[in-house]
Amino acid sequence: MEKKNLLNVIKKVSFSLFIVIIYVMGLYIPLPFAEGTKQYMEAVKNTPISILGAFSGANFTRISIFSIGLNPLMFSMLIIQLLSFTHSFGFDALSPKQVQYLMQFLTMIITIIQAALLVFAFTNRRNGLEDFEMILILSAGSCLVVWLCYRNMKYGVGASAPVILTSILNGAIPNIISNVKLLLTMKYAWIWLAALAIFILLLIKFWLAFTKAYYPLKVVNPSLPASSNLMTVPLGLNMAAMMMYMVGMAILTLPLMVGRYFSSSSLINNWVFQASFSAVMGILIFYFFTFVNFDPKEQAKSFRNNHYYIPNIAPGRPTQRYLNRLIWIIAFPGAVLNAFQLVFGLYGGNFLGNYAGFAIIPMNVVMITMFMGGIKDQIDTILFPYRYDRLLKDN
């Protein structure tokens, strides 16, 4: 049994590594007929679209068959979550299989739209057949990446996390190397390098602690003895961060894709407007996924059905209203911190000059830490039976 459990872990990790290898290979397979125009390459260089793409498994810097990545999937996930959370259009009547089909259909439609926008962006020379083939190949490549992530969810570790983590590292490692080279040209270079390393370590420590931080909601359980009938329901202060970055980044790519059809002086291409829009969207998406993770209405109903209650708060609607207010308050620090880090990572380079590359480091560090933490937690869960077998053997 012990060998069987350990073998299962090795198989899952190996399958995830196999998925990553396929993804990396696809990033280096060029898209046929694609010729990046000067306008497109300048847009990639002067806008944060390449950064935005990396956080959803896309790669707009290198035009390949996997350039779109998981970007459309993030859009469809948000739409499904909105329909589910708001109970709109009779969504509750759908079976899980129907929801899955709807999500796949939405992903396909969004994939085709994004593929068309990308094709029209990186080439000015129009050829109907070539454009169609490029859109078809980009769509097929994105669908393959999505399918690989679904397979990884079943047979591997981390679902889409290994693909997105690889995409982030693909951009983060060259950025860090170039920043280190820049620091080495400065006076007291080793002091600056040490300061950068300490800053990164402190940042990792802070975000690990903040991710685990929670508000202890006290709930009375009448079935327990009166002396110890208070239970603690942990409300995470940063429970929506990962979804905010993944989904938010995917959404923010759309205005940048559409922006090329407007003049450079238009509002949509103004970086101050883009930064403000990103901040607002970041906060809204953070709050949305916080409410998705902890739905006050469903929690109030669950408390009432299990005969739990919050001290001095009546069950039912009063509890729901109390939880609503509580979530708005306790999620505020996480919403502001993550939105600030998002905006600074995307647009901090506009006022850092020669040191623009340092702006993205904090956001990269946070996302790498979160994804690696999520993968580690899943591996620990898979390893639990193996550790349990060893414990029985020792006894």
Swiss-Prot record:
Main subcellular location of this protein, as a coarse class: membrane
Topological relation to the membrane, as annotated: Multi-pass membrane protein
GO biological process: one example: protein targeting
UniProt entry tagged with the keyword Transport: yes
Entry keyword Ribosomal protein: no
Record keywords, A-Z: Cell membrane, Membrane, Protein transport, Translocation, Transmembrane, Transmembrane helix, Transport
InterPro entries: SecY/SEC61-alpha, SecY2, SecY_dom_sf
Record GO cellular component, one term: plasma membrane
HAMAP family for the chain: SecY2
Complexes and interactors: Component of the accessory SecA2/SecY2 protein translocase complex required to export cell wall proteins. May form heterotrimers with SecE and SecG subunits.
Cited function: Part of the accessory SecA2/SecY2 system specifically required for export of possible cell wall proteins. The central subunit of a protein translocation channel.
Full protein name: Accessory Sec system protein translocase subunit SecY2
Species: Lactobacillus johnsonii (strain CNCM I-12250 / La1 / NCC 533)
Lineage of producing organism: Bacteria, Bacillati, Bacillota, Bacilli, Lactobacillales
